[in-house]
Amino acid sequence: MERIKELRNLMSQSRTREILTKTTVDHMAIIKKYTSGRQEKNPSLRMKWMMAMKYPITADKRITEMIPERNEQGQTLWSKMSDAGSDRVMVSPLAVTWWNRNGPVTSTVHYPKVYKTYFDKVERLKHGTFGPVHFRNQVKIRRRVDINPGHADLSAKEAQDVIMEVVFPNEVGARILTSESQLTITKEKKEELQDCKISPLMVAYMLERELVRKTRFLPVAGGTSSMYIEVLHLTQGTCWEQMYTPGGEVRNDDVDQSLIIAARNIVRRAAVSADPLASLLEMCHSTQIGGTRMVDILRQNPTEEQAVDICKAAMGLRISSSFSFGGFTFKRTSGSSIKREEEVLTGNLQTLKIRVHEGYEEFTMVGKRATAIVRKATRRLVQLIVSGRDEQSIAEAIIVAMVFSQEDCMIKAVRGDLNFVNRANQRLNPMHQLLRHFHKDAKVLFQNWGIEHIDSVMGMVGVLPDMTPSTEMSMRGIRVSKMGVDEYSSTEKVVVSIDRFLRVRDQRGNVLLSPEEVSETQGTERLTITYSSSMMWEINGPESVLVNTYQWIIRNWETVKIQWSQNPTMLYNKMEFEPFQSLVPKAIRGQYSGFVRTLFQQMRDVLGTFDTTQIIKLLPFAAAPPKQSRMQFSSLTVNVRGSGMRILVRGNSPVFNYNKTTKRLTILGKDAGTLIEDPDESTSGVESAVLRGFLILGKGDRRYGPALSINELSNLAKGEKANVLIGQGDVVLVMKRKRDSSILTDSQTATKRIRMAIN
């Protein structure tokens, strides 16, 4: 107070005012503050007083030859005075206007290429549709979101190497372009940017936008894909939202979405196979998404979703340290606990063995449609503050938190037996049993939980067992809040381990993820997902299994043919025939298999009875464990299109139709490809069965005596030549090889040479 009086007193004297307003500033500290360092201390002020001057801009001397001294209105564009401290001229802002209107025009061809991200954005906004504005309370939670649509997914280092290679190809420095995407992008950009006059630094900045994913931790209510984030300022305020439908797609959002679908399908399929982990890896390595290998996408894409993270863990990549339960992502924010096995009794007196977490802990729970803060002690929920889009979402979050708390009243609320199984028909672990039980019906759980009187707290309301809000009462410890809970912001990743059954644990042994946590939601992928693994043939139903099985045989016919004659058992056990078995009626599988195997054996024994079409057609049936019986079949049944359809043992049928003239195979009316070899020639298989270890020299030669039979051939010495009878009476000259060669090359060259010899 005293100081203020003193200052008022000083200001009332006229001399003080004059000193303060008129004298120059010569205090060293002040001069230092505004002159030291390159950083402008008051940019807007500086800009204002610079622009108030007549010639605030400096330009290269050459400008005087390119711009007239005065414009059409007679205003001076540049001063004859040169800039103090440099050999540049002082120029008026009017010169810029003149240049923009009358200056030289360079080629604009590179602009859309360099500024691609901007041009694309304009297109998206032009074709996007903005709907009505709604006024309502917005529950925003901070999430880590992708802020530049249309980018590739290179790491910062990879992008840096690409940019250096494209923009500054002659600069010294080690650049290693290894990944396929790096090489493709580099080649593409070098071609696009030939003779580009835009400043290299600008090109580098723009390339970075195109190549690297940039994420920010932003408050969002609604869509989180980059196409929605770029219009965040137009679609949601504090108390309003505007509907928006993006115009067009951007590849990065499509990749994220398709990756999640592929990962879910793969994890679900792997979980039911004999060795889930091996199967999962095999599928990840043989799947492509939009033409890019899935494993390459997994290495670069930071998407955090349960199935995606299981695939990453299997590949030995680091993942987020948060764990998943009931479809929510939990992150411990404080406290600690130790785990102990405990046996508990359900309301139905069934014993459950659960791993109890002893100790006080706090967690954030983040789901797609609801978020919460959970505070719990040993087997006790202390507090749950939940917020969500609607009643249903809030109820789901409450159920998950109640189960997570492991409270006794929750376990006692179980009515009936718990015997839920996963896709592989294995019993779920107790915590997931409870979760599934209450997801079906949580009435008893909510009724038994208990109710308490509540104090009114700003922004919070109570919730009753029937999910109606109340300001007086609430389920014990549970409140609904207007404010959302932010997602965990840290991007730190941890080393994890994964077991055979796809359970992912951190280094302390806590389970972070398991196949039970993978969402059952089905979606349609935006990019084409190509699963090359036979395990995924079932994904599109029985027809796809049928087509894929036969396509596989046709594509690999050369190898299949040799195995058929040399090592049939190995061929019958191939995993590619596994999916097919589900199409064959269970009761008769064994008989079919026995019948087909016997038929094949006769074909091997009796020369000239090899029939390509028939082998291809019947091979998948031979894969089941055979039952010996004297039964003969003229047709075999497969279950497709909801009923049994017949495949004729001899001849074509709607299921399996082979056109000998075009060599095209049609399965259920769909094209299944072309056989590269003519099955009409009965020689086609014999040569592979017989002529392994022999080189075909050409047509038969009388000087080498009469044609030998197949059996006599085996007596030849290495290097010895002989005529041999093959197929339907054709004679060729062969020589026994001097060294053993691969089965494959022998039979492939045999096929070609026999044709040449015969024709």
From Swiss-Prot:
InterPro entries (alphabetical): Flu_PB2_2nd, Flu_PB2_6th, Flu_PB2_C, Flu_PB2_CAP-bd, Flu_PB2_middle, Flu_PB2_N, INV_PB2, PB2_helical
GO CC terms: host cell mitochondrion; host cell nucleus; virion component
GO molecular function: RNA binding; RNA-directed RNA polymerase activity
Primary role: Plays an essential role in transcription initiation and cap-stealing mechanism, in which cellular capped pre-mRNAs are used to generate primers for viral transcription. Recognizes and binds the 7-methylguanosine-containing cap of the target pre-RNA which is subsequently cleaved after 10-13 nucleotides by the viral protein PA. Plays a role in the initiation of the viral genome replication and modulates the activity of the ribonucleoprotein (RNP) complex.
Location of the protein in the cell: Virion; Host nucleus; Host mitochondrion
Originating gene: PB2
Domain of life, per lineage: Viruses
Residue(s) at site: Mammalian adaptation: 627
Short motif Nuclear localization signal, span: 736-739
Organism: Influenza A virus (strain A/Kiev/59/1979 H1N1)
Any one Pfam family match given in the protein's UniProt record, by short name: Flu_PB2_5th
Keyword presence, Transmembrane helix: no
Alphabetic keyword roster: Cap snatching, Eukaryotic host gene expression shutoff by virus, Eukaryotic host transcription shutoff by virus, Host gene expression shutoff by virus, Host mitochondrion, Host nucleus, Host-virus interaction, Inhibition of host innate immune response by virus, Inhibition of host MAVS by virus, Inhibition of host RLR pathway by virus, Inhibition of host RNA polymerase II by virus, mRNA capping, mRNA processing, Viral immunoevasion, Viral transcription, Virion
Quaternary structure and interacting proteins, as annotated: Influenza RNA polymerase is composed of three subunits: PB1, PB2 and PA. Interacts (via N-terminus) with PB1 (via C-terminus). Interacts with nucleoprotein NP (via N-terminus). Interacts (via N-terminus) with host MAVS (via N-terminus); this interaction inhibits host innate immune response.
Gene Ontology BP terms: 7-methylguanosine mRNA capping; cap snatching; DNA-templated transcription; symbiont-mediated suppression of host cytoplasmic pattern recognition receptor signaling pathway via inhibition of MAVS activity; symbiont-mediated suppression of host gene expression; symbiont-mediated suppression of host mRNA transcription via inhibition of RNA polymerase II activity; viral RNA genome replication
Name used for this protein in its record: Polymerase basic protein 2
Family designation: Belongs to the influenza viruses PB2 family.
